[in-house]
Regions:
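Active-site donor-binding segments of glycosyltransferases and PAPS-dependent sulfotransferases
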Residues: 1-56
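Conserved donor-binding/catalytic core segment of Leloir-type glycosyltransferases
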Residues: 143, 149-184
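Acidic donor-binding loop of glycosyltransferase active sites
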Residues: 220-232, 245
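A charged, aromatic-enriched C-terminal amphipathic alpha-helix characteristic of glycosyltransferases
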Residues: 271, 289-336
Length: 338
């Protein structure tokens, strides 16, 4: 647990006490809705949930306001269900159809309990509308703006994140191997051995045990950042831009709202090695229009201060809206009784 969390009043659910829940949480998915519904939130006038799965399913008082900051509708339940199923083991493939059918029903019911949705991107707002039939307001997530002095860029690309199949780090590894470009991969995960096997001599794996200072050093020195995966927003390209370098290789159908094509980075149109390699070559040939200072300045639109201000203003406005609705309802009920 981060040190600054220790001063908070953190109250966990009974799920925290289930043996091996921290390691086998995926297998215990059917228990998660019950765990969140067990929270007693009757003393709260405002409930703010941060959800990519089940936390939006908490139960609140009828006169309380529940605002959900939604990172995504549950990916493995909705549009990514078939992809997750295809990458699962045989036992998971056997039980997934029945379990996911039940989860879809519960997830829609849970979404109906939310009074107001905030989406972390316009892409997620579209998915909320698609699967929950709900409107949402967009507030982009935040990133710490690095104010370290710029250093001379070195001749390597960087990618950072968990090494799981949906991050598609394999595209970056194969593209840089094909182009004979140096790539530094920071992160650990189940795909590490597979990625090592396909990597050429220009690919370096640093694992997931680096300190924050070491990761920052690579961010500052890299000449470009590769982000080939499908994400709901994708905060790592913003982190790269705070260091003043371009995000070369972002797929435009997903998670690219933080990148200005041709100015602070490039998009590649298809999630293939060929498309990413072409994007890297364009970056090598043409560069980007913005300077390091301008790229960092663009990243300030995702600052912590901006996020805190927008979120507070939104919550206060929705609280006022909700109170007005309650007042209007009470007047209507009084008129009906009269």
């Amino acid at each position: 647990m981060p040190e600054h969390f220790k001063s908070y009043d953190i109250r966990t659910s009974w799920f925290q006490k289930v043996p091996f829940s921290n390691r086998l949480y995926k297998a215990m998915l059917p228990l998660m809705p019950r765990a969140f519904e067990a929270f007693d939130l009757t003393e709260y006038d405002l409930v703010l949930s941060s959800s990519s799965s089940c936390s939006k399913g908490v139960i609140t008082r009828p006169d309380a306001v529940h605002i959900c900051y939604c990172h995504t509708p549950i990916r493995y339940v909705w549009d990514f269900y078939y992809t997750y199923r295809d990458n699962a083991n045989w036992l998971a493939k056997l039980v997934m159809p029945g379990q996911m059918h039940k989860m879809r029903i519960w997830d829609k019911c849970a979404a109906d309990r939310v009074d107001y949705f905030i989406a972390n991107s316009h892409y997620i707002a579209q998915r909320i509308k698609k699967y929950y039939r709900r409107d949402s307001d967009v507030i982009y997530p935040c990133c710490h703006i690095n104010e370290s002095p710029f250093v001379e860029k070195e001749d390597f690309y960087l990618t950072v994140g968990r090494l799981t199949w949906y991050k598609r780090v394999d595209l970056a590894v194969q593209a840089c191997t094909r182009l004979n470009k140096r790539l530094v991969v920071i992160g650990g995960g189940g795909e590490l051995d597979k990625l090592r096997a396909m990597a050429g001599p220009t690919i370096e794996f640093k694992g997931g045990g680096l300190s924050d200072e070491e990761v920052r050093s690579y961010y500052l020195r890299a000449k470009g950042f590769l982000f080939p995966g499908e994400e709901d927003f994708g905060i790592t390209p913003v982190e790269a831009q705070t260091r003043g370098h371009a995000g070369a290789g972002l797929w435009p159908r997903r998670a690219c709202e933080s990148v200005l094509p041709g100015r602070t980075g490039y998009w590649f149109k298809e999630q293939t090695v060929e498309s990413l390699a072409d994007c890297i070559e364009r970056f090598e040939r043409d560069g980007v229009a913005c300077s390091k200072e301008e790229i960092r300045e663009h990243s300030r639109s995702f600052s912590e201060e901006r996020f805190e201000r927008e979120l507070k203003e939104y919550c206060l406005r929705r609280m006022a809206d909700w109170q007005q609705e309650l007042l209007d309802c009470s007047h209507w009920e009084k008129e009906e009784l009269d």
